[in-house]
Amino acid sequence: ARLQSIAVAAVSHKPLGRGEGGGQSMVSRVTTVAFQGIEAKPVDVQVQIGPGQVAFTIVGLPDKAVGESRERVRSALIASGLSLPAKRVTVNLAPADLPKEGSHFDLPIALALMAAMGALPAAELERYVVLGELALDGTISPVAGVLPAAIGANTLARGLICPAACGAEAAWADPEMEILAPVSLIQLANHFKGTQILSRPQPKLSANPLVLPDLAEVRGQESAKRALEIAAAGGHNLLMIGPPGAGKSMLAMRLPSILPPLSPRELLEVSMIASIAGELADGKLSERRPFRAPHHSASMAALVGGGIRARPGEVSLAHNGVLFLDELPEFQPQVLDGLRQPLESGETVIVRANHRTSYPSRVQLIAAMNPCRCGHAGEPGHVCRRGERCASEYQSRLSGPLLDRLDLRIEVPAVAASDLLRPAQGESSATVAERVARARRRQSERFAALGVAARTNAAAGARLIEQVAAPDAAGLDLLQSAADALHLSARGYHRVLKVARTLADLDGAEAVSRLHLAEALSYRGAALERRAA
């Protein structure tokens, strides 16, 4: 499928009349992009070479990396056989109120300078969008964000000039799109002269050589495997509580093996975020869903996003995939609470004094934790070293609103020795993945027929899930009594309906029955409270 998205850039060149100093001033314009989230905003790079005191000035709200471009551009031009004229060189990045970040402004500034000096044909540059970083020897280094820029350039029927290392990434925008991916300024200049023709780079898919861990390798834990299948089928969040060594991490690591591959639209979204973060290895796209497992020492900026340049965090890099948080209570409470908005809205918003940045963050949260700091609270014959309050104090690090967003909460007991000695006889990931794929197709077809954008039951809104998961009379009675007994919030009520709808989809049932609701409520039960008691 051809990737479609946001608009970015165009290129133009315009000579001006004589300046006040009596000499002729030349202004060349090359439009590049500045990134806000995965959106590329057009930036007009205006270069003027005119009379006056010899200087090289960059204005237009540049950050430090952009401000340093003057030295990289100057050295790259000298290495390429050109030198700046002994005149006043002014570079304006418009609009001035849009923050300019990153080193990808080097190449458009250099090309605008070369066009103003007559070293490159300005008319040819009008057909391209330009971005790239320059090394001191005139070579062009890779930069982040080439894929969003290429998609936008294709939307405007423009070509793209980007570093050679990013050519494969840019080629995904459209098979007919004109892309120049030079190694150096000299190679690009020779291409425009006709002495060295650059061939179009070709798109690449990651080979994914690593075999994913198989669910059949997990001994015992049949109830946990069932919960994992439900989570995969409906895109539900899952919390596993159990002692050390019970297999919680082992189960989580096998979730990607039963998830369906990315759809073309999901592949686009995932790849654009990876491109912005500079994590698109060799420009190759992968159909596997992201699986991110940050350490519990991760900061707010690392997990949710932020920093000086408002970069995407782990929750955004896991978009359309899995975010696995092991040892959940060991994360800083304020960091975990920062996940509440992305889990609810599917979007991370980072606000700065002068701009607002958002990243898609529709993730499936899989969390694992011990019941207490000792790890064995609630087990027969075990007494916590820290006393009866060990479990309650440990679990109090998790806020109620965060727990309310976890659709499935299960206990993962210690594996019995008999299960470890018995040969593995469980279902393979391929078998479970087939059932998951059928359930997801039912959801996709149902939501498409209703004309809504949701793809999974977990992503459905409250009104929509009430419509598609309306229980029968017996199920309604059970739900009403359980809502009082479990003190379900409005969010908890709707999440029970979502899980019940997924159970019905796994069974191939059109309607949600009492049995589906009963099982959904069992996963909403007070697993934490039982362990803490």
Model-derived segments and their meaning:
Residues V59, A65-R70, P85, N92-G102, ...:
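Basic, amphipathic alpha-helical bundle interface domains used for macromolecular binding and assembly
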Residues Q196-I230, G234, R265-V315:
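P-loop NTPase nucleotide-binding/switch module
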Residues M240-E279:
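Walker A/P-loop
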Residues G242, G305, E327:
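The Walker A (P-loop) glycine that initiates the GxxxxGKT/S ATP-binding motif of P-loop NTPases
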Residues D326-E327, G338:
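Walker B catalytic acidic pair
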